[in-house]
Design a protein with these regions (language model features):
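Active-site core of bacterial EAL-family cyclic-dinucleotide phosphodiesterase domains
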Residues: 2-53, 86
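Catalytic core of bacterial c-di-GMP phosphodiesterases, primarily the EAL and HD-GYP domains
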Residues: 29-33, 59-131
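Cyclic nucleotide signaling catalytic output domains
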Residues: 1, 5, 49, 53, ...
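Hydrophobic pocket-lining residues within nucleotide cofactor-binding pockets
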Residues: 22-25, 38, 90-92, 97, ...
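A cross-family glycoside hydrolase active-site/sugar-binding cleft signature
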Residues: 18-20, 35-37, 84-88, 119-121, ...
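The catalytic core of metal-dependent phosphodiesterases that act on cyclic dinucleotides
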Residues: 106-174
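Short acidic-capped amphipathic helix/loop micro-motif used as an active-site/signal-coupling element
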Residues: 40-44, 68-72, 150
Length: 174
């Protein structure tokens, strides 16, 4: 069931995208977080529910390419907004994906690249830090910002905070 649903979603251009403002303590919108949902025929399913299956089926690279390809045109629609998208570490550590990401980002104006925030889960950062460092340096050099979310959810070393150029930490509410 899951595999069919995910493959259909990918063949139709990806998940449904929604945006949620991330607001500072001062009440200012820092960025808009793009959230993904898929429709299973009855209801919408959040990415928290289906992403483990995307990873299990080895479809994260295709999924992340679709999301980034869909994010870029949104930068033109919202010229004043910073847009954040969750990207899997599994995609980012693959050289083929890194080349695609570099080439795709190079086609954007620098002013647009500065408004992209790639979000990574802290557990993935802790697990893949040495393999993530080069691609984080690459995207930072291109002007793209990096955020780490779910910080504090799992027990991982915090040494990555000094090792990676992360602009934003999003704490897990727990």
């Amino acid at each position: 069931r899951w595999r069919t649903l995910i493959e259909q979603m990918l063949s139709r251009g990806g998940p449904r995208l929604y945006q949620k403002p991330a607001v500072t303590r001062e009440g200012r919108v820092h960025h808009r977080e793009l959230m993904c949902r898929i429709f299973d025929g009855n209801e919408e399913v959040s990415s928290a529910e289906y992403m483990p299956m995307v990873l299990q089926f080895g479809l994260s690279e295709e999924y992340d390419r679709l999301l980034i390809s869909r994010l870029i045109p949104l930068l033109r629609y919202w010229p004043e907004e910073n847009l954040a998208i969750q990207v899997t570490a599994e995609s980012l550590i693959r050289p083929r994906f890194q080349r695609w990401l570099r080439d795709t980002l190079m086609q954007c104006e620098k002013s647009q690249r500065r408004r992209i925030i790639i979000e990574l889960a802290e557990a993935d950062v802790g697990q893949h830090i040495s393999r993530l460092q080069p691609v984080i340096r690459l995207v930072n050099a291109l002007g793209v910002r990096v955020a780490v979310n779910q910080a504090g959810l799992t027990l991982v070393s915090t040494s990555w905070i000094k090792e990676l150029n992360v602009e934003l930490l999003k704490l897990h509410p727990g």
